[in-house]
Amino acid sequence: MQADLSNIIALYGGSFDPLHYAHMEIIRLLRENLLYKRIILMPNYRNPLKSSSFFTPLQRLQMCKILADEMNNAKSCNQKIPYISVSDYEVCQNRSVFSVQSVAFIKEQITKQDTNAQLVFVLGEDSFNNLKQWKDVEKLCKMVDFVLIKREISQKDSQISPHIVPYAHVIKCLDLPPSVAHFSSSSVRSLLQKGQIDEALNLVPVCLHTFIKANFRL
C-alpha cells in the first residue's frame, strides 16, 4: 500500500513506561519531516507481550498529555508543524489490546474526519523485527504502512529482519541520534528502583519531572 505523503497521520504507540528523551526525539523527528498532518500518541494499557507496567496506565496517559502539550506549545517559526494529540483508546479498554485492533479503530476515526487521510504506524526497529510474533500481522500490514525508527548502535541492530519485509511496507526510516539512541524506559525504571532519582530524571524530559516525583514511590 503506497501512502500519499501529503496526507498522513502518524500513530506512535507504546508503553511509554515512562517517556524519556528518545521518545521525545522520535516525535521531534516526525514533526520535522513535515510529512504528517498529525501525530497521535497512544499509550497502551499493557503490552500483550509483557506481564505488567511500572507506572499505571492512567499515569502513562497523563505523561503523554503533558509532553504533547509541552511540544505543541513550544514556539516554532514553522506554522505547518504537525499537531500532537493523545489517544486514550487502549487505556480505556482496561485490558491488553492488540495493535491490529487499535489501528482499525484509529483508521475508522480519522477517515470519518477526512476520507483521504492515511495512517502510518511508527515502530522502533526492535519491535518491527518482532512483528511476526504479533497477532494478525498480515492483516495489520495490509492496513498500514510503517515508519521505522532505527537505533544506530551496532551493525547488527541496524539490520531489518528479512522475514518481515515481505509482510510490511516501510515508507520511511528515521535514525535516532547517538546522544539518545541508548536511552530506554527500562534504564529509567532501574534507576528509579535504585533510588537514583536525579540520574533517572536526567533521561526524562523536564516537563515530566514534577509528575514523576509526585507519582513515583519506592
Curated annotation (Swiss-Prot):
**Carries keyword Nucleotidyltransferase?**
yes
Gene3D superfamilies found in the cross-reference section: HUPs
**What family name appears in the similarity comment?**
Belongs to the NadD family.
In terms of superkingdom, the source organism counts as Bacteria
Q: What is this protein's function?
A: Catalyzes the reversible adenylation of nicotinate mononucleotide (NaMN) to nicotinic acid adenine dinucleotide (NaAD).
Catalytic activity as recorded in UniProt: nicotinate beta-D-ribonucleotide + ATP + H(+) = deamido-NAD(+) + diphosphate
Which Pfam family, giving just one, matches this sequence? Answer: CTP_transf_like
Tell me the keywords, alphabetical order. Answer: ATP-binding, NAD, Nucleotide-binding, Nucleotidyltransferase, Pyridine nucleotide biosynthesis, Transferase
Which Gene Ontology molecular-function terms are recorded? ATP binding; nicotinate-nucleotide adenylyltransferase activity
Q: What class of enzyme is it?
A: transferase
Q: What is the lineage of its organism?
A: Bacteria, Pseudomonadati, Campylobacterota, Epsilonproteobacteria, Campylobacterales
Q: In which pathway does it act?
A: Cofactor biosynthesis; NAD(+) biosynthesis; deamido-NAD(+) from nicotinate D-ribonucleotide: step 1/1
For this protein, what is the EC number?
2.7.7.18
This protein is called what? Probable nicotinate-nucleotide adenylyltransferase
Q: Which organism is it from?
A: Helicobacter hepaticus (strain ATCC 51449 / 3B1)
Any single GO BP term: NAD biosynthetic process
